[in-house]
Amino acid sequence: MRGRDEDTGEFRGASRSQQRREALEIFDLGEKLVALTPAQLAKLPVPESLIQHIEESKRITSHIAHKRQLAFLAKHMRREDDETLAAIRDALDANSDTARREVAAIHRVERWRERLLADGDVALAELLEAYPAADRQQLRQLVRNAIHERAKNKPPRAYRELFQVLRDLSQEQGLESGDSGLEDGESALEDDE
């Protein structure tokens, strides 16, 4: 109950500004939920009643009607207990962290590919030293073909195949957690910023 306590004179409950901030946070959470794909949404601990409102919000495309439907979704979300909303927020944060790590791993593989194309045998020797299971002949041939394709302005078939081989190597042997393929002075944290 809001208002002043008759005995002590202190205010009860959250202030109106605090309630408004909490309502806006829930509205933003609703927008994030509506932006998710059905597969992503299925992984979250969202109650069935909210899923119906989320799907309804996705269906409406008119700007004002969509915003009104989001407000309606937020109203229903405010009726949920705090633990449910906290679980949804935590799951969304975990999903975004996972996506960020996957993107960082892809960037590291791309840096290895560019290093192999720029430095040739020196970078290849470093890669093979760190990951002896890699196929030297296949990698050398892909690097040579990718350089040739780039010089002749041909479609980058070998360039893409080199990326796929490096990505498979990273998934098998943990390339993303080992040597990142960075030049001296570069920071591995650049991907996380």
Curated annotation (Swiss-Prot):
Q: Which GO terms describe its biological process?
A: assembly of large subunit precursor of preribosome
Q: Which Gene3D superfamilies match?
A: PSPTO4464-like domains
Which UniProt keywords are given for this protein, alphabetically ordered? Cytoplasm, Ribosome biogenesis, RNA-binding, rRNA-binding
Which subcellular locations apply to this protein?
A: Cytoplasm
- The annotated regions of Basic and acidic residues compositional bias extend over 1-10
> What is the protein's major site of localization?
cytoplasm
Q: Which GO terms describe its molecular function?
A: ribosome binding; rRNA binding
Identify the stretch(es) annotated as Disordered. 1-20, 171-193
Q: Where is the composition biased (Acidic residues)?
A: 181-193
Listed under GO cellular component are: cytosol
* Biological function: Member of a network of 50S ribosomal subunit biogenesis factors which assembles along the 30S-50S interface, preventing incorrect 23S rRNA structures from forming. Promotes peptidyl transferase center (PTC) maturation.
Which protein, by its recorded name, is this?
Dual-action ribosomal maturation protein DarP
| Source organism per UniProt | Xanthomonas oryzae pv. oryzae (strain KACC10331 / KXO85)
